[in-house]
Amino acid sequence: MNPTLIILPTVNERENLPRMAQKLLSLPAGVDVLVVDGNSSDGTGEIADELAAKHPEIHVLHEQKKNGLGRAYIAGFKWALERGYEFIFEMDCDFSHNPDDIPMFLEAAKNQDADLVLGSRYSGGVRVVNWPLKRLMLSRGAEIYVRIITGMPFSDPTGGYKCFRRRALQAINLDAILSQGYSIQIEMTHRLWRQGFKVIEVPIIFTERTEGHSKMSGHIFRESLIMVWRLWLQNGLRRRPHIK
């Protein structure tokens, strides 16, 4: 077993999953892959099973219904902790997140003894490819909104390319996570930051998918806007502890 696990939530990613799996398995660092399939209707789950049968590094969890990104990651985190992985990644399956950046995340986590490494689209400038101006403005506005309400100092608190250390995930009550969907990106980062864990950022380039369809929707956007207030109310005026 490799010490690093990549969690790939999938819903209808048949075009991307085989290519992503091949790319991840070719990385020199050596990683295991967990596909958490949300009851895909296009055969993605079956493709994942076929890949797992050929490659011992690939594993699959099947959800009986589309429970949302948040529930998929919680299932993946629990699976990873039960099996002793040291570094656990969140990552999109559609190549929006470049697999070649994984060694950079690992190096940053080890060299800086970080508990959570965030891939930032906005560290030192804007690093987004093939987004229309409207979407870029909405994204930047959301980042500012989250930072103001939560107090988090990070340039990209809503990003979805992350590397957690085992000790950080162990410190969170995963059953108490509120998020069902994309707002888990905000909630997990906020909980670790509030608990005093060391969170750092590394710059990444985010490239809009070329295969399949985006899962972003108005409901997802609204959930994230509401989540920051739930986190604020939950924490009140409690002071954040010093970094561990």
What is each PLM-predicted segment?
Residues L24, G76, D94, R165, ...:
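Residue-level signature of catalytic and energy-coupling elements of molecular machines
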Residues D37-I47, F95:
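A conserved acidic beta->alpha catalytic loop
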Residues P3-L5, D32, E187:
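Cell-envelope/extracellular polymer assembly enzymes that use nucleotide-activated donors
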Residues L61-E82, F87, P99-Y182, R209-S224:
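Acceptor/aglycone-binding surface of glycosyltransferases and processive sugar-polymer synthases
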Residues E13-N16, S40, N98:
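Donor nucleotide-sugar binding loop of glycosyltransferases
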